[in-house]
C-alpha cells in the first residue's frame, strides 16, 4: 500500500483496517469502508473522526458493491468472507471493482476442526443455552480447506493466489472471561449476561474448564488459533 492508492475495506466492521489504510494512502488517496451493519458503521464513523483523508463509510451488500468497475487498487476483507452466504458472488464483486493488477488481501479463521478449543466452547453453549448458540459460535470459521479457498479465488478470476496459515496464541485470564469476551459482540451476549449471576453460568464455566483442562495454566487459558491469510491479483 502506497500514498495515493484507492482502498476498499469490505465487511469493514468497526473500521480497523480502513483506519490503518487511511494513514498509509494519505490525503491524495481514498478509503471506503463497506458493511451492511449500521451499528458497526456508527462505531467506525465515531472512531475515525479527524482522520485524513476522510474515510467514506457505506452501508451496502458486498454481493452488489455500489462502485464502478476498476475503482480500487486494493480490496481488503478481514475476517468477513466466512459470514457471506454466497462467497463466490462476493469475490466476483471484489474482482470487478479492482483495477487491472489490483490486489486482494483477506483473512478468515480456518475450519473449526483446526480450532478445536472454539468447538468445545460451541458445544458448551449448545448444551447450556441451545442449538442456535452453538451454531452462532461456529459461524466465524470458514468451512473451506486451503485448496478449496484457492479454487474459490481462482474461479472468481484472481491470479497469483497465495495462502498462508497463521498460528498464534490466544490467551484469556479465565474460562469465565473466555466465554464472556467471545460472545460479547454476538447476539448471545444478552443471554450470557442474564446467566452471569446465576448458578447455571457457574455450571457452564465448570463444564468448559473440564473440557479445556490441558490448556489451563497459572495465568488462565492459552491455546493456538489458526487463520488463513490470502492474497491475490486481478
Sequence positions of predicted segments:
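Conserved hydrophobic residues forming the short capping helix/wall of the S-adenosyl-L-methionine
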Residues: 25, 48, 125, 153, ...
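Conserved catalytic/acceptor-binding region of the Class I
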Residues: 88, 96-173, 189
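A short SAM/SAH-binding and catalytic strip from SAM-dependent methyltransferases
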Residues: 73-87, 110
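Acidic/polar helix N-cap motif
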Residues: 61-64, 68-69, 86, 145
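Class I SAM-dependent methyltransferase SAM/SAH-binding core
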Residues: 6-65, 74, 89
Amino acid at each position: 500500500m502506497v500514498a495515493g492508492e484507492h482502498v476498499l475495506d469490505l465487511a469493514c466492521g468497526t473500521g480497523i483496517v480502513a483506519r490503518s489504510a487511511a494513514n498509509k494512502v494519505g490525503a491524495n488517496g481514498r478509503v471506503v469502508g463497506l458493511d451492511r451493519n449500521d451499528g458497526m458503521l456508527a462505531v467506525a464513523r465515531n472512531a475515525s473522526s479527524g482522520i485524513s483523508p476522510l474515510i467514506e463509510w457505506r452501508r451496502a451488500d458486498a454481493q452488489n458493491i455500489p462502485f464502478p468497475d476498476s475503482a480500487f487498487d486494493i480490496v481488503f476483507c478481514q475476517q468477513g468472507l466466512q459470514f457471506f452466504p454466497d462467497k463466490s458472488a462476493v469475490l466476483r464483486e471484489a474482482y470487478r471493482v479492482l483495477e487491472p493488477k489490483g490486489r486482494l488481501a483477506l483473512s478468515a479463521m480456518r475450519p473449526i476442526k483446526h480450532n478445536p478449543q472454539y468447538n468445545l466452547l460451541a458445544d458448551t453453549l449448545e448444551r447450556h443455552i441451545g442449538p442456535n448458540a452453538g451454531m452462532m459460535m461456529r459461524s466465524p470459521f470458514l468451512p473451506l480447506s486451503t485448496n478449496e479457498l484457492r479454487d474459490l479465488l481462482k474461479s472468481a478470476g484472481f491470479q497469483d493466489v497465495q495462502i498462508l496459515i497463521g498460528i498464534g496464541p490466544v490467551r484469556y485470564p479465565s474460562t469465565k472471561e473466555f466465554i464472556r469476551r467471545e460472545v460479547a459482540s454476538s447476539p448471545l451476549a444478552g443471554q450470557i449476561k442474564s446467566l452471569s449471576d446465576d448458578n447455571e453460568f457457574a455450571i457452564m464455566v465448570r463444564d468448559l474448564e473440564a473440557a479445556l483442562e490441558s490448556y489451563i495454566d497459572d495465568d488462565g487459558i492459552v491455546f493456538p488459533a489458526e487463520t488463513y491469510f490470502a492474497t491475490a491479483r486481478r
